[in-house]
Amino acid sequence: ERMVNLTLEMIYLLTGEHYIPRKKSDDGGALHAPGSVIQKENNKNDKKILELMSNIIQLLTGEVAIRTGHVSIYFSLDEWDYIKGNKDLYEEGIKEEPQQPLPPDCEYEDKSDITADLGGTLYNYNEPSKIRAEGGDFCANGNPTNPEISPMKQPPPANGIKEEVASCDGGRQSDCSINPLTEQIQGTDIPTPIMGYNHLIIQAIKDNENTSPHESRFDRHHTTHTTEKQFSHHINLHNDLSIHAGKKPFPCSECGKCFAGSSELNVHRRTHTRVKPFSCSQCGKCFSNQTKLKYHHRTHTGEKPFSCSECGKCFSTPHVRARHQKTHTGEKPFPCSECGKCFARSSDVTVHRRTHTGEKPYSCSQCGKCFTRSSDLNVHRRTHTGEKPYSCSHCGKCFTTSSELNVHRRTHTGEKPYSCSECGKSFPTSSEFTSHWKTHMEEKPFSCVQCGKCFSKDTHLKYHYRTHTGEKPFSCFECGKCFTHNGSLKVHLKIHKREADFCSKGNLTNPEISPVEHYPPTNEIKEEATSWEEGNQSDYSINSLTEQIQGPYTPTPIMEYNHLIMQDNKYDVNACHSPLQETDVTKHALHKRDIDRRQRTQTQLKYDHRTNTGDKPLSCSECGKCFSTYHVLARHQKTHTGEKPFSCSECEKCYARSSDLNVHRRTHTGEKPYSCSECGKCFTRSSDFNVHRRTHTGEKPYSCSECGRCFPTSSVLTSHWRTHTGEKPFSCTECGKCFSRETYLKYHHRTHTGEKPFSCSECGKCFTCNSSLKVHFQLH
C-alpha cells in the first residue's frame, strides 16, 4: 500500500494528474482521475521526486545508502538502526583515525562535495563545522555551485583506498583518505568502527536528527558515482576490492597459502600456532574461534535451535542438521572407488578407504595403539587420562562419551522413548523393549537340554544350567561364599555393607555395643572367660544362632558378651600384639576377627564404589586396558604372560582358567552333553549350543547401535563394531599388519609359514582357509 501511494504521488508530480486510489465500487471502477492538473513548480517537484524515488528504492531493497565521493556504502535497515544507536562507538573511531599527509602532486581544478543519501533524504558534507577530513577542511568557504568529481587516476592500492578532492579555497589542497577498514572480529555481533567512514556516519545521524523529513537536498546531490558496491553487515571495503580484483594479498608465512583478508589469515594462522584464545567458562575447554565456542556452549545448555523440517529433530549447529537431512533424502554422492559403497560425506569415504589400505594414521603416544579416526583416538586417550568430559547436570556423574551421558539422562528425565504397541508400556532402551516384547509373544526360545525348561533370555538359561552343573562363579571377597549369578552376590554383599556402616559409626570403641553381636557365627559358641568385674569366673553361652542365610538378616544379640570384648576402650589394634593369658584367647580372637573384617569390608566398599561409578583405575601395562579390581587385572595379564596353571592330565595341554580345562577334557572323553532337539547335533559347550539354536529360530539378539544391524552372537557384534570404529587390535608379529578379527590374523599367518591345512579330496590341491576350498570345490 505504501509503495502504491509513493508511486501515485510521483505520477502526480510528473504529470500533474492527481490520481486517488479508491476501493472497488459496485460499477467496477478502481481508480478515479479527476483530471485536475496543477501548476508544477519544477525545482520543488524535482526535489520531491528524488526523495520519493529514494523511498521506493529503500522499500524494494531494504537498504540505506551513504554516498561519499566515488563510493556508495549500503546498510541494511537493522544495521543503520544499530549505527544510530551506537554513534559513540564511531565517534571514538574518528578520534583514532591517523592523519594522512597530502601528496604534493595532486591538483584538481574543481571543487567537490560529499553527500550521503539516508532513506530518501540526501545529506551534504561540505560545511567545515560538520565534517573534517584527515588532511584538512572540506569546502571551508561554502557550497560549490557546479562541482565535478575527478576520476581516479590509478586502481586503489592494496593497503587502503585514497581519494583526493580539491579544496574550496583556490589552490589549497586537502585529501580525504579512506583508511583500511578494521577487521571484523570473528564470531562477535558488535560492529567495529569503520575507519575513514565514521565522520560520514556520525554526520548523517546528526543531520537525520536535526532535519525535517520533508526538507529536500536535491540541489546538493550532484555527485557522480564511478564505483558502487553493497557492503553487507560489518564493512570491509579493502577486502571487497581485493576480491573484486581477484587478489589475495595476505600470504601465510608457514605454508604460503594466500587469503583475501587479514582476518582470514589470522584465523588460518591458529592452525599452525595451535592458539585457542576462546575458553569455555563452564569446563575450561578452549577453541580457536568464537563460533566454535558458541556451538560448544550449547552442549552445556542443551540448546538446539536448528530443527529438521521432515521429522522435527533438533540440532545445535546448522551443519549437523544439514548432515542429518541427507538421511531423509538418501543422498550419498561420495562413492568408494574400491568397492562402490556410497557415503553422504566426503570425510566418511576418506575414512572408509582406510579399511582397504589398512592405514591407521592416528596413534596413541602412551601405548602406541593406532586408529583410523581421530575421534576414536580421542576416546581411547581417556582410558589413560581418566578424563570423563561429559557430566550430568543433575547428579554430577561423568562419562567418557556423549552417548553414555544421553542414556544416563533418561534416569533423571524419565524419558522412555521405546513404547510397546500391545500394552503401552515404555522403556528407556531398545534392549529392554526387546526383552519385554517377548513376554507378549510368549517366545521362550532358550530351552534346557537337561530338564526341558524354557527361558526368554539366554542369560536366564545360562544361570539355570548352573543348577545342573553346580557352578558358582561369583564369590564374595569377604567370606568366600559363592553364588550362581551376580544378582545373588549383590544381595549377599548387603550383609557386609551393614557391617561397614556399623564400623564407620565408631562402635568399635563403644563399650556399650559390641560389633561381634552383628557377626552371627556359623555354630554355637560356649566359652569361659574372666569377668572384668572383681575377677570372677563366669560362663557365657551364645544360643539360637542359626547358620547365616543368604540375603538380609536380623542380627541376634549376644547376651552379656559385650564386656568380654571391650571395656573402657582397653582393646584396640595394638592390643592384639600384647601378651595374652589363656583365658583371654577368645576375647582376642573375636576382636582380631573384627579388625580383619573391617579392613576387608573397606576394600569391598571401594570395589563397590568403582562398580557404581564405572571407575577403572587399574590399567594393564602391556595394552592399556583398564579394570576395576586387581584380580580381574591379574586374570587379564595372563593373556600377555602366557601363564596357564591348569594342565590336562591326558595331553598336558595348559589353560589359564579351570573352566576352560573342564571343557577341554570333553575332547578326550567325547562327551557332548548339549544336543539340539531340532537336528540332533551335539556340542561340548552350552554357549556353542545356544548359538547353534539361533540358526533354527533366526534370532539375532545383538544389535548395532550405529546402523541397527543384528547379529546372533556378541562376538560377531564386537567384530562388526570395529568396522565403525576402525579398530584393528590383532597385529602380525612378522610384518605388523593389523586385523579386526583374530581369524583373519590366523589366515594371514599362514602366508608367512606357508601352511595350507585345507586340501581338496578330488585333486589334492591345498588352501590356507576353508572358504577358498569351498570355492575350489565348485570347479569340480
Swiss-Prot record:
Gene Ontology molecular functions: DNA-binding transcription factor activity, RNA polymerase II-specific; RNA polymerase II cis-regulatory region sequence-specific DNA binding; zinc ion binding
Keyword DNA repair: no
Keywords, in A-Z order: DNA-binding, Metal-binding, Nucleus, Repeat, Transcription, Transcription regulation, Zinc, Zinc-finger
SUPFAM superfamilies documented for this protein: beta-beta-alpha zinc fingers
Entry's localization field: Nucleus
GO CC annotations, alphabetized: chromatin; PcG protein complex; transcription regulator complex
Keyword Lyase among UniProt keywords: no
Zinc finger residue extent: C2H2-type: 250-272, 278-300, 306-328, 334-356, 362-384, 390-412, 418-440, 446-468, 474-496, 618-640, 646-668, 674-696, 702-724, 730-752, 758-780
InterPro entries: Znf_C2H2_sf (IPR036236), Znf_C2H2_type (IPR013087)
Biological-process GO terms, alphabetical: regulation of transcription by RNA polymerase II
Location, primary (coarse class): nucleus
Family: Belongs to the krueppel C2H2-type zinc-finger protein family.
Function, as annotated: May be involved in transcriptional regulation.
Protein name: Oocyte zinc finger protein XlCOF8.4
Species for this entry: Xenopus laevis (African clawed frog)
